[in-house]
From Swiss-Prot:
Residues 230-393 form the Helicase C-terminal domain. It comes from Schizosaccharomyces pombe (strain 972 / ATCC 24843). It catalyses: ATP + H2O = ADP + phosphate + H(+). This is ATP-dependent RNA helicase dbp8. It holds the Pfam family DEAD. Its EC number is 3.6.4.13.
Amino acid sequence: MSEHTRKSFSDLGISPWLIDTLKALAIYEPTDIQEGVIAQILEGRNCIGGAKTGSGKTAAFALPIIEKWSKDPSGIFALILTPTRELAIQIDEQFAALGANLNLKHALIVGGMDMIRQSIDLSKRPHVVVATPGRLADLIRSNGEETIAGLRRIKFLVMDEADRLLSPTFADDLDDCFSVLPASEDRQTLLFTATVTDAIRQLKYQPQKNNKPPLWLYEVETDNISVPSTLQQSYIFVSSQVREAYLVHLLTIPENAKKSAIIFVNRTRTAELIYSILRLLELRVTELHSEMVQRERINSLGRFRAEAAKILVATDVASRGLDIPSVQLVINFDLPRDPDDYIHRVGRTARAGRSGESISIVTERDVDLVHAIEDRVGTKLSEYEHVSENKMLEYIKEVTDAKRQASLEMIDRGFGERRQKRNEKRLMANGISNKLKNSGRKKKAKNTLSTEK
């Protein structure tokens, strides 16, 4: 069997001037996902691309979009939707880098930033808009036609991390976003994800309108997303009452004290609490979760990348897609409900052939989750042997005191009030939107009845 000869960017249809930009960014040949989809996108096909984090997915859609935009540089050419602010920022940065020599105008539309400024940016018709569904939906609901008119003529819709965007969480916001876009037959739609679900695969069989070529589905290793072979996976079984004390014990034993680590939790309140406890205990820690404003999140990631903080406490916002360097240790303070989320979390370590370690803190309520994870990864987690109950008990008092103080600080700061206000604002906006929709339906029904008479 002959070895596969990798195609060049030129073979895929990328112009010399854009190849020169790639070389300036030290990108010399396409990755598997880029090789698999770029030519098909340039041919005008709708596309689903599946590849793991760090495989070059963003350039796989950014390059053909810029290539086609250069031949027709008008209006809002492409809308890229992604589930988190951090992913949106990274995509926006890649478009900025790839389009730097072309006067490509791009706008970032995400929460945590000035909404009026974003409305103005959108009304200026940038060539590429990178957005989270919630903030774009807010702008659509609260602004007039002048602001959103450019979205009605886009040539490309990209949904990055499509498996998450197509979950019920984003359904209402996506409905509002899609309501101002061209019909599917009048644009190219590109879906990219690290996990190609059966529901996404079924989209391949939907008939294409306006004589469009069949949808192109290309997967790289996504049917077997797996943990790295160099990863050591273990667990400690503890009472739920002493999880925080065991966590501090884990972080401070000689084997782990100097390691860079990400601690994953399931809720923003837990992330804030654990971060505050570790900060009060004078560990070099930072945090990342959706309750932080954008400036705080960027600063926090910067501290972790620069190793000013050795520990990052995070929700699953940090498990996929973010430009975070490989760490030496991943700790699951909370086990995820979905075993695939476990794989994405522990995939933050043992990258590029390096060794790494993951430790899951398991309580009496987590046994079924552990079994599901073991079935998914195809191996048993080993028991972590470097902690002891006697040593953990030495931390109980100071951890309990720190937890009490951290809880009081969160109450004093009104932690969670920002989300509550945002939800109230969104409910109000949805109420107005629904009234307008219902009004439109009644008017349409009335007109229909009038016609029938």
